[in-house]
Amino acid sequence: MADDPSAADRNVEIWKIKKLIKSLEAARGNGTSMISLIIPPKDQISRVAKMLADEFGTASNIKSRVNRLSVLGAITSVQQRLKLYNKVPPNGLVVYCGTIVTEEGKEKKVNIDFEPFKPINTSLYLCDNKFHTEALTALLSDDSKFGFIVIDGSGALFGTLQGNTREVLHKFTVDLPKKHGRGGQSALRFARLRMEKRHNYVRKVAETAVQLFISGDKVNVAGLVLAGSADFKTELSQSDMFDQRLQSKVLKLVDISYGGENGFNQAIELSTEVLSNVKFIQEKKLIGRYFGEISQDTGKYCFGVEDTLKALEMGAVEILIVYENLDIMRYVLHCQGTEEEKILYLTPEQEKDKSHFTDKETGQEHELIESMPLLEWFANNYKKFGATLEIVTDKSQEGSQFVKGFGGIGGILRYRVDFQGMEYQGGDDEFFDLDDY
């Protein structure tokens, strides 16, 4: 889905934050003891610490004893968390602390602090009976940055759009000679001069685009839109002078009635649909590549939990593709008799069968050491296997086919692997029950 690993890592970060938002939104507490604190990048830890000390004094006057103690406890937890930082991290700091009530009605303390994957320009401190995640949601909505080149006969404008923020990076005007019938014997020379000036103008636009949209040898925008009223945009997109890396990122050519800033606004309006589908298109491309490996029978693919984990262990997986709502859980169990660890991968249906958690010979129940969704385990560990993790949806036709036909888990491999002729080295310490696939 992403051409470079950094974009894939970013997608994993986004998925982690989405998951965090989901669990924070569902959490509820008694009273107002749930603290949401967001510190923007250039703020000072000392200022926030002083503000918390003042809040601590104010909270000491709360009438209800239970609420007072839980609020003071939450403020103390936040203060302890802040002591771990000398200064605010480059992207800001998000802290959630408080006592939540679980589904069983038990109280549970929550302490979360992390630096978001990109700058969060919001300052927030709230005590409430729920966590406030609006700023985090806003962080996700506008994650991709798109480049715009507005080019017509009077000048060119270069801009970017990220979420709702548009920015003009550079603009210049140009004075191109118009077509005319005068000149007599010099008419051809005039036409040649005019073509030469046009050519130089297109070259200048192409060179400026490289300076603005390529940094460190990589394109710094998710896609490019070329807009204009004449055929300059077509000329630019087909020109040899236009950098190949940028050419491959062109999403759309847009016809507009104006140049300059008005044209920029119009270009944004006319290309909103394309921009919102970029992730969708990247996903279709990725799964299309995966299906291509299967249809050509290259052997450079795997699907299902068992084969994918074998390939990961071998370091053969280049791109690990997992459905965002994969419902397989990973259990680490300790066998009482043999003192061995056993790892299970079960779907919700299989979890109901308690025989997976007991020793078949002795009937003893295994001790549960760890349980977490398999996707979460992948998100935490995929780098150890030298793979990039791509989390896909089932909204596209390809995505839906991948989830229904391949169980929502698979990978594109670096080299051919013959799974049939390979005996798994781990013996019986791993159990895969894949009847559902």
Swiss-Prot record:
The modification N5-methylglutamine is found at residue 185. It comes from the Eukaryota. GO terms for molecular function: translation release factor activity; translation termination factor activity. InterPro entries: eFR1_2_sf, eRF1_1_Pelota, eRF1_1_sf, eRF1_2, eRF1_3, Peptide_chain-rel_eRF1/aRF1, Ribosomal_eL30-like_sf. GO terms for biological process: nuclear-transcribed mRNA catabolic process, nonsense-mediated decay; regulation of translational termination. GO terms for cellular component: cytoplasm. The keyword Transferase does not apply. Hydroxylation at Lys-63 by JMJD4 promotes its translational termination efficiency. Keywords: Acetylation, Cytoplasm, Hydroxylation, Isopeptide bond, Methylation, Nonsense-mediated mRNA decay, Phosphoprotein, Protein biosynthesis, Ubl conjugation. It is found in: Cytoplasm. The modification Phosphothreonine is found at residue 347. A motif (NIKS motif) lies at residues 61-64. The modification N-acetylalanine is found at residue 2. The modification 4-hydroxylysine is found at residue 63. Component of the eRF1-eRF3-GTP ternary complex, composed of ETF1/ERF1 and eRF3 (GSPT1/ERF3A or GSPT2/ERF3B) and GTP. Component of the transient SURF (SMG1-UPF1-eRF1-eRF3) complex. Interacts with JMJD4. The ETF1-GSPT1 complex interacts with JMJD4. Belongs to the eukaryotic release factor 1 family. Component of the eRF1-eRF3-GTP ternary complex, a ternary complex that mediates translation termination in response to the termination codons. The eRF1-eRF3-GTP complex binds to a stop codon in the ribosomal A-site. ETF1/ERF1 is responsible for stop codon recognition and inducing hydrolysis of peptidyl-tRNA. Following GTP hydrolysis, eRF3 (GSPT1/ERF3A or GSPT2/ERF3B) dissociates, permitting ETF1/eRF1 to accommodate fully in the A-site, followed by hydrolysis of peptidyl-tRNA. NCBIfam families: aRF1_eRF1. This is Eukaryotic peptide chain release factor subunit 1. The gene is ETF1.
